[in-house]
């Protein structure tokens, strides 16, 4: 049997919850067991499977750990340090999520590559001691954000990001967001703090999609953001 362990400080244990919830499909395929345990300072996810599934489970575990760093840790750093004047709290959230998603794929690949020789995935320790270049890159982004950022600037920034991406779409239905294969997206679960009712907007922005199809009526906060920043890239397909 092979054992794969993911560990995180209790203050960031939403990362472990995200990884577990995102891995249930693969765990089921392998017939693997998974347990979440807690002690005074840490939350641990322990997955056990037959040896033949080792590389399979490691691959998806490393992808999910990389996502937790490239979204959760990055957002926390940006939320703390990026506070330009000129934006409402809603628009600031849009800016933060847009910055996180702008080079998400690149960040995720970088993190995943450095996880290859890790035996126990201690996320906070790995971030603090093995990702110095990535932290310096993120600090450089923070330094580039002007002290004043207008709604027009934000619109131009979103237009630029969306125009540079390969076309892709997501689908909103009954309060949830789905990718092109109708797999439910849950990346916003990696974000702690911020506006309480903003989760579905974060999900759209973090998806990296260039188009949004609404199959049911979206909540007002999402509707406003889509009309303001996605415009014709949004399709409302409900009566």
Predicted features by range, described:
Residues 1-198, 202-204:
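Conserved mixed alpha/beta catalytic, RNA-binding, or beta-rich assembly cores of soluble enzyme
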Residues 181-239:
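C-terminal structured domains
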């Amino acid at each position: 049997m092979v054992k794969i362990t993911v560990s995180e400080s209790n203050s960031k244990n939403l990362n472990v919850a995200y990884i577990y919830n995102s891995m249930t499909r693969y765990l089921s395929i392998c017939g693997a067991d998974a347990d979440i345990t807690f002690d005074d300072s840490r939350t641990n996810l322990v997955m056990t499977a037959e040896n033949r599934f080792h590389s399979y489970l490691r691959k998806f575990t490393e992808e999910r750990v990389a996502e937790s760093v490239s979204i959760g840790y990055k957002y926390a750093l940006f939320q703390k340090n990026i506070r330009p004047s000129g934006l409402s709290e809603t628009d600031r959230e849009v800016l933060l999520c847009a910055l996180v998603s702008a080079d998400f794929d690149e960040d995720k690949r970088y993190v995943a590559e450095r996880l290859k020789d890790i035996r126990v995935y201690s996320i906070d320790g790995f971030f603090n001691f093995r990702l110095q270049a990535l932290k310096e890159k993120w600090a450089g982004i923070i330094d580039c954000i002007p002290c004043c950022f207008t709604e027009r600037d934000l619109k131009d920034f979103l237009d630029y990001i969306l125009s540079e991406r390969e076309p892709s779409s997501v689908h909103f239905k009954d309060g949830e967001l789905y990718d092109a294969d109708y797999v439910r997206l849950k990346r916003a679960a990696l974000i702690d703090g911020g506006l309480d009712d903003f989760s579905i907007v974060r999900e759209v922005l973090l998806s990296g999609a260039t188009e949004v199809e609404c199959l049911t009526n979206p909540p007002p906060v999402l509707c406003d953001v889509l009309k303001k920043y996605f415009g014709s890239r949004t399709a409302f397909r409900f009566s």
